[in-house]
Amino acid sequence: MKISGAVLLAVVAVTPAAAVDKKATKFAEGLKNLDLETRLEQICDYEAMRRIGRDGKEFRPDRSQSNAVSEPKHEGSMLIANGAAFRSKGQWYRFSFTCKGAPDHLSVVSFAYQIGEQIPEAKWEEYGLWK
């Protein structure tokens, strides 16, 4: 099921701005087909890309994985991801985040993150990352 969710996230992440509203609606509709844990991971990964891209000019995330280095911890509507990774300009970076979703896991209520080090390309395969 996570692969399907990753595909949904990828469609929204690489879409031109003119089509974002339509793709975002399609993304939200697709989320309803996922189990609650996967849905929470998807909305939190999407929020991570949005926030990191918005908060500075250094990064332009096009992918985010809450479970890249280690599995995230689910606590109801809260997702704690200490082993997350995001891709920006062809490079992967470690980061951690805490994300609280709405009860239906279709939107984010609160989100905080911290960016870590760049992940060496030699580690990408080990973490399931790609170019």
Question: What kind of feature is each model-predicted range?
Answer:
Residues M1-L8:
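Sec-dependent signal peptide recognition
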Residues V12-A17:
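N-terminal signal peptide c-region/cleavage motif recognized by signal peptidases
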